[in-house]
Amino acid sequence: MLLAIDVRNTHTVVGLISGSGDHAKVEQHWRIRTEPEVTADELALTIDGLIGDDAERLTGAAGLSTVPSVLHEVRVMLDQYWPSVPHVLIEPGVRTGIPLLVDNPKEVGADRIVNCLAAYHKFGTASIVVDFGSSICVDVVSAKGEFLGGAIAPGVQVSSDAAAERSAALRRVELTRPRSVVGKNTVECMQAGAVFGFAGLVDGLVSRVRDDVDGFGGGDVNVVATGHGAPLVLADLRTVEHYDRHLTLDGLRLVFERNRDSQRGKLKQAR
């Protein structure tokens, strides 16, 4: 059983994956709040409480974090609480198998890398990955499996909250799909702007990639959405063909397997 840990700016997803290769399956997953000041001990208590008896069945662990301080605590946690479980954390120097054709590869978020790796492995074609998190990342992977770059926009919830915070006449609203693009009250107006506005933003970015990037204008390009915020706008997206809620967890598994296999089945054990 592989323990997969996906730490983002606001929330963390913990998953348990059974099997490997084409037989891999996400058996369970949980979403918890990310605390930037969390300690390794606190992480261990939380994760051990979630996975229960499966802690004794772990054969590996893979993790990423967009919060550097938490990545350090994840490493310490694995070293101290699961010292016999081989692990890999996505950071510079780790073999991911996806070339980063950008100005500064060290700037590329680990989440973006594993998403594109998983999409290329899933489809085997040029792909566009749209990850709906605290930011919306539209990332591009070539037909050769190369990360070409992408675009980053503020996330739906972040933008809606910022509008409410900076305007005396607006308030924070629950983000659900409104009955019409033409809102009849302030809440519906904000919901319409968030849902339909960001659907248009994503469709616009995907269409521009198709128009402007060589090799992306044909029908052999797959567009996949992932992330906790994706279901909010999926029905209104005209350019996205696929949705994979576990794309990032699958990418973590692929990186773990690549590093395990490259070392004849043995990753460096936790210290």
Swiss-Prot record:
Pfam families: Pan_kinase. Substrate binds at G109, A110, D111, R112, T186. Its cofactor is NH4(+); K(+). InterPro entries: ATPase_NBD, Type_III_PanK. It is an enzyme of class 2 (transferase). Its main location: cytoplasm. A monovalent cation. Ammonium or potassium. Keywords: ATP-binding, Coenzyme A biosynthesis, Cytoplasm, Kinase, Metal-binding, Nucleotide-binding, Potassium, Transferase. GO terms for cellular component: cytoplasm. K(+) binds at D131. Homodimer. Belongs to the type III pantothenate kinase family. Catalyzes the phosphorylation of pantothenate (Pan), the first step in CoA biosynthesis. HAMAP family: Pantothen_kinase_3. This is Type III pantothenate kinase. It comes from Mycolicibacterium vanbaalenii (strain DSM 7251 / JCM 13017 / BCRC 16820 / KCTC 9966 / NRRL B-24157 / PYR-1) (Mycobacterium vanbaalenii). The gene is coaX.
